[in-house]
Each structure stands twice: as C-alpha cells, then as structure tokens.
Amino acid sequence: MTPRRLFAALSLALFALLASAAPAAPTNWLANVTVTPEGSHILGNPKAPVKLTAWVSYTCPHCAEFDKVSDAPLRLAYVAQGKVAYEVKHILRDPVDATVAQLTNCGPKERFFGNHAVFFRRQDEWIKTLAGSTESQRARWSTGDYAARRRAIASDFHFYEIMEQRGYRRTDVDRCLADNALAERIAAQTAEAVKIGFEGTPSFSLNGAPLFGTYSWQQLQPQIRGLL
C-alpha cells in the first residue's frame, strides 16, 4: 500500500471511530406528547421516574395561576430533563369547562399543550362572559342538542376566534365540539377524579398517589424533588 493510500485508509478509520464515539443527540422531551388509552395527554419522557398528573378545570382561577407559575420550572427543570412526565386530566365543573376541554383536545395530539396553555393564559378575558351572562344566554348553553349547546358557548365566549388564531378553521372547531366520543372520554376523567376523592382544583397525583390538600406549585414542587 502506498503512503497516500495508507493515509486515506487511516483517515477513514479515524472518521468512523469518531462518528461512532459521538454522543447521541439528546431527546427533546418538550416535543414528546403521548395520549393514554383514556384520552389524557402526557408531555415528556413516558418512562420518567416521576409521573405528575394534574386534574384541572378551565374556569378555575387557581388552575390558571398554577399553569402560569409552574410552566417554566416544570418544563425546563423537570420535563425537559426527562425526569418528570406531565399528564393533564380534566375536571368539569360546568358546560363552559366541558366546551373548553373539547377545544383543547381538538386536532393532533401535538396541539394539546399549546391549546391548553392559551385558554389558561387568556382566562381573564373570556371568563368575564360567564360572570356577565344573561338568563337567555345560559338557556342557550343548556338546551338543545349537545353540539348546539357547545357551539353557543364557543360563540358567546369568542372561543372560535381563539381557535382561529391557533390555526383552526371554524369547521374544524365545530367537528370537535360535536365529537361525542371525545366528550365521554373527558367526562370519564372527571368521574375518575370524583372516585379518587378530589374535592378541589387543581388536584394532583405523583406516581399514582393522590396529593390531597396540594393545590399550588409551591406545595407541589418539594414533593416532586423528594422523588428524584
């Protein structure tokens, strides 16, 4: 073998060695969303040592506050590192909750956490409609077929506009609001929370163990740390 060929062969061998020794790119757990058989959404590493489940209501101010305060530390310090898998389930307190829950679940699974966040971020805007609603409005929300009631709520609360800003067409929204199977899956999550014995929102469990009396990120975070 000539010196030139020997050098080329050694260079290729060295390149192959370096390539095989290079560390694998870290998994972007913040982009990893899975859906359980029950229809709830999980963000992060499904094999994380800690599984946090939050039961929330979209009309609940404390839930919106939890989402706001916990968002950065939960995602960056725990979910992104693959240490915590974050699951969201629904507790329905009224027809408005049910409508928003169907909208957050609308579309591909990857859209859920973005939809979930925007309805909490804008809760102060749309919740005013509930406080100032008229008797005739409330009648529209509770009479007629299921889809018609949800469409009335979506119209009165300007949810169509919120979803359009998220890239949805009105026909997409109406299809999700008419999805009875989705409504049943969401209602089953509420039934599960009642069976567990949760009495307020937000409520939490860690690795399947209910955290009764824990309602805030300040109370929750030390308990997450204790499992890591």
Residue ranges, per PLM feature:
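Extracytoplasmic thiol/disulfide redox context detector
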Residues: 2-98, 190, 194, 227-228
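Cysteine-centric redox/oxidoreductase cores and disulfide-bonded domains
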Residues: 92-200, 205-209, 214-218, 225-228
